[in-house]
Amino acid sequence: MTKKQKKMLYRILIAAALFLAAKFVPLPPLLSTLLYFIAYFTVGYDILHKAWKGICNRRVFDENFLMAVATVGAIALAVYEKSGDYAEAVAVMLFYQIGELFQSCAVGKSRRSITALMDIRPDYANIERDGKLEQVDPDEVEVGTVITVQPGEKIPIDGEIVEGTSALNTAALTGESLPRDVTPGDEVISGCINMTGVLKVRTTKAFGESTVSKILELMENSSSHKSRSENFISRFARVYTPAVCYGALALAVLPPLFNLISGAPTVWGVWVYRALTFLVISCPCALVISIPLSFFAGLGGASREGILIKGSNYLETLSKTKTVVFDKTGTLTQGVFEVTGVHHSPMEERKLLAYAALAECASSHPISKSLQKACGGKLDRSRVMDIEERSGRGVVATVDGHSVAAGNSRLMEELGISWQECRSVGTIVHMAVDGAYAGHIVISDVVKPDAREAIAALRRAGVRKTVMLTGDMQKVAAKVAEELGVDDFRAELLPADKVSEVERLLGEKGSGECLAFVGDGINDAPVLSRADIGIAMGAMGSDAAIEAADVVLMDDDPMKIAKGIRISRKCLRIVYENIVFALGIKALCLVLGALGLANMWAAIFADVGVMVLAVLNAIRALRTSKN
């Protein structure tokens, strides 16, 4: 508990003790009255002060005003009727403050889930000067500076490891508890915790442009993006509170005046009591507090899973998603090409791969890198000479004194070499050695292990249509779509074509339904912004993704798309439950109070009891299922 919460708890305990003594201990009337008043001012002085400030600032109608008028009115009525029973007035204020403390603790709990993410902000960076480590502000570190990260410290700035090996805890960013091993040459991002070894990192970004700064900015701005439900409750409260105040005034004045005109007893005390009861019941705290808290808890629960949602309006949109469109590369597939087969080769596979890797060693193309990776170990580039790159076809080189050609079918035809068709799906690299066909190598983008299950999980989450967009060949796209079980796909698309496809799908969706686009955030900014909701996957370290998307998944796990949708739907379900429950109970109690069938104790339940139950329901949004 915070100091403020502890202070409130002590005030409540003191007031409760005085209240119980005055209520149940046989005491002289004067002493009993004194205890009631001490208890009332102990627990309620801040409410009275806020109500007075509101009146002075001409912002009269709020929950503080309602509580002040109701309790002061109840005390005045007890004085007027000389009953000496101030218990109800004190009880209203006491239980109201108990409810306020409870909701403060609930907000604190959900805020801590966001604060845990905020703890990724580093306090300092270590720079070595004159053989000693000096702590400096991360903002002062220039790009290209080598910083030292000790075990247990946060990596303060994005960079590349130049020395040391370690394991990194990325849980605060990704929600993934399994440490990630890093070695020299690996890129690291700010916000991760170094667990084992000392690392020296060369910074590649300024602190303000680093991942941790972008994420913190995103989370700090999330509260400004309010949902329709929150905006509705804000507008509702602005109209509702003055309306019930005037309603209570009418209830206190009009029936006695009518009785006076008709010659019946005025019974002012009865109607004033009913009006005060009406005021207590009408307090909109349950709605005003629990609705924003539900969204806040939903955002907090999602962030603990490595799903960053930029505001409650996006959470609300995500809950209505019925169509999910994927960009294939980097979302459903690894985005990393791998050798998946060597066919019809008269020579040893390893030797053919070595020839291909050496011939392609001067190229930075992903296919060349996949050949070098499949070959294993470091390549001896002295073995290759006379490299001739033939644009759009392949490469010809001399390896170990042999003429080696590696490329597509057009290169083979150009060299007059007969080649064999491959039925495998992927990029085919045909090989020729000394003018003779030596077989072909199949290179494919590998499908993520849980991509198929992610599509199935989306269906279970209520998504009706999944579509895959890709720039790959029709044959490759068809195989991936069939393997994953997506409903539809479009192949051989340029970036502009993807925008057109999303616009077409937006025109086909039903009323009240939303379309989500999932991309890796690197080349997808136009499509991410065009969809109802843009989801960037694997965005750790990607500024473009964090800027362009509405929802940011901090790792490459496609299962988190369905999890994010489930979290959003649970949150919205809780919001609607609270709205219906709070309005239903209050409407019933308001009618009973106006008819004189509900006393002040029923009013306390209708106010504080409903608020506590609504807040308890709201913090359920923090809990996320692990499956």
Spans of features found by a protein language model:
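N-terminal membrane topogenic signal
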Residues: M1-I14, Y240
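Bilayer-spanning, highly hydrophobic alpha-helical transmembrane segments
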Residues: A16, F232-S262, T277-F295, Y576-F605
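Conserved catalytic phosphorylation-site environment of P-type ATPases
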Residues: E63-T71, L173, Y273, C283-A359, ...
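Membrane-embedded transport module
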Residues: G247, K509-G512, A549, M554-N627
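P-type ATPase nucleotide-binding
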Residues: V339-K465, Q474, E483-V502
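Conserved ATP-binding TGD loop and adjacent catalytic N/P-domain core of P-type ATPases
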Residues: V399-G401, T427, V433-E577
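Actuator/coupling domain of P-type ATPases
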Residues: Y36-Y124, E128, E140-E142, V146-I147, ...
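Juxtamembrane helix-loop transition segments at the membrane interface in multi-pass membrane proteins
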Residues: W52-D62, C105-A116, L293-S312, A621-N627
